[in-house]
Amino acid sequence: MKIYTIHSNSHEILYTDYFLKTLPDEFDVISTQIPQECSTGDFYKPGWDITCYRKVELFIRACEDNMGEKFIFSDVDIQFFGNIKDILIEELGDYDIACQNDTGNMYCSGFFICDANERTLNMFKKMKENYNSEDQTSLNQQIHLCKSKFLSKRFFTIGHITHSVWNGQDIDIPKDILVHHANWTIGTNNKINLLNMVRKKIDYNG
């Protein structure tokens, strides 16, 4: 199965030191590097919308290249804690797409498993045609076009606990997580600190 990801120079350290370093040997990695159109790489800074638009373009290409098969998309601010392929397939079941739960009934466009079919391809194309600010808003506005569900909270974000932006506070982390997505914080340095905190807690508990 293919796992797709995309990043610019500001997120290279996340790609090499966290995503690739912890990714289980179950996938063919299809990585796309894009220009640094957002100078900081930070959430909603100038150029962020263009960067997110590149993700939507990638969703379309990935779907077209895998018709009749399943694929995964993952942001690079993600680390893994074991094998996930079979669990993702099981959780997807007969749905078209299963996304990380970003809390508040919001589907996260930063980590999902997708059955590449006409419904999901149409959804991704509608996201591009009706693009609204960034990829996640666009996904949630068009996801009704296919059969969707949330992944279990083993596919973890700190937002499951805090429901607010993380600024360095100590948090107890569930012991059974399989994936940690370092969203719900702003800036590459904060993402690194959050990834390290979660890794340390899981390694200690293990």
Regions found by a protein language model. Give the residues of each.
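GT-A fold catalytic core of metal-dependent nucleotide-sugar glycosyltransferases
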Residues: 51-107, 111-121
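Short amphipathic alpha-helical segments and helix-helix/interface helices
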Residues: 17-21, 59-60, 85-89, 136-140, ...
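Short, flexible loop segments at the rims of nucleotide/cofactor-binding pockets, characterized by
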Residues: 46-50, 77, 130
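Short, solvent-exposed loop/turn segments at secondary-structure junctions
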Residues: 9-11, 36-38, 78-79, 103-106, ...
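N-terminal anchoring/stem segment of glycosyltransferases
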Residues: 1-69, 116-118, 173-174, 188-206
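Catalytic core and acceptor-binding pocket of nucleotide-sugar-dependent glycosyltransferases
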Residues: 118-206
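A structural signal for short, well-ordered beta-strand segments and their strand-loop junctions
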Residues: 28-33, 72-75, 98-99, 149-152, ...
